[in-house]
Amino acid sequence: MDLAMGEKNMPKILINSVPKSGTNLLVQIIKGIPGIFQDQKVFYQSENYLKVLDIKPGELVSSHIPKNEEFSRQLKSHSIKQLFIYRDLRDIAVSLVYFINNKLHDHPLFPVFQKRILTFEEQLNTVICGIELIGDEKNNKYGIERYPGVFHEYLPIYKWKDDPTICSMRFEDLVCNENSKDIEILKIIDFLWEDLGYLKMDKYHLLNMMKQNINPEKSWTYRKGLIGNWRNEFTADNKNKFKEVTGEFLIKYGYEKNNDW
């Protein structure tokens, strides 16, 4: 069987994610499928979201698209399979502080962290709570005058989790151990195909091919990819600020049973 790019039986795949939730890990896993290709890397700007609908069989794109019922219906009508990955927002907040300081220098908070908010604790509170930008900080490429905080910025993306038309997964389940990783990847395979016959392999052979394509060192955004590293970084004040801003968010998304963490 010729598995040339665009083979008509191949799925059209959108990887949608909360930023800093293992987007590139999931991309590597999916690119381990024979015949999957990625011509255009990302569709992160809002004006590009509808271009996702034009992807071809076998094509993979990734983005950070907020939940939208009409877009969900359009994906279904275009036979596009959405894989959605999310992560503990506390680990995302910590990761984002490091990412802004070390690599993402066009982020609106980079000049804030360079000149105004200097300690890690204060920077983490800024990512959690948001901040009004002042002076030259307003001259950012996004044209914003206030950074809203990671909760308010990303909550509309998290809301995809309960969409019944997609395959939703937690970053933690892809990395915590081999058994849970296998369960998640097999879930992806079952979501993408009803019948693997034309690939001339069974799902466990495909599972191993997908796992063998994982290489964190190839990811520009990769730092540690740890689970629960927030415990080493959050101060008591960070915890209080997070609870004030997010309410019962962690409980709803299965990361805590109550707010006594």
State where each predicted segment sits.
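A short acidic, often aromatic-flanked loop/helix-cap motif at beta-alpha or helix-coil junctions
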Residues: 68-70, 174-177
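Generic recognition of short, well-ordered alpha-helical segments
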Residues: 25-28, 179-183
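PAPS-dependent sulfotransferases, especially Golgi type II membrane carbohydrate sulfotransferases
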Residues: 2-13, 79, 138-147, 151-162, ...
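PAPS-dependent sulfotransferase catalytic domain
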Residues: 1-169, 245, 253-258
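Short histidine-centered beta-strand/loop micro-motifs
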Residues: 74, 178-179
